[in-house]
Amino acid sequence: MTRFLSISSFRKRLADLLKVRRGVYAGVKSEICTAFRNATIEQIRQNRDMILMNNESVVIKLRLPDKRQRLSRSDGYRLVYMVLKTAPVVVLLDIYPKRGPSQQLDIEDNELNMLILEFVSELKSKKLLEHDIENDLNAKQ
């Protein structure tokens, strides 16, 4: 069973997107869940845009559609996540829209490095949060 964890920056970014007026990004949690639901860890590790790879993990940028606004994968969201090579674990690092009031065109190398350092720090301090991909990305009890 694949475990889905997140760092605090991801959770803050997701919460900020959900607060944007008129519910512009209201479908973001659903799109994330749909992308991973019923996928094996092998499927999650492959067929994506790899950003960074080392001996222990792969960082991937996944293109997600925004079906609520009728945007294709190229105009929807970018989900940046890390997949561990030694365990069935996915760590959600960042999410950003390509369109709309909170749009971001890409993730810079220094931003990515900061997210990875945050993961290492939160892993050590046990601040990572586990999510239920079958239950709208809610925190697992």
Model-assigned labels for residue ranges:
Residues 40-70:
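A short, surface-exposed loop/turn module that caps and links secondary-structure elements
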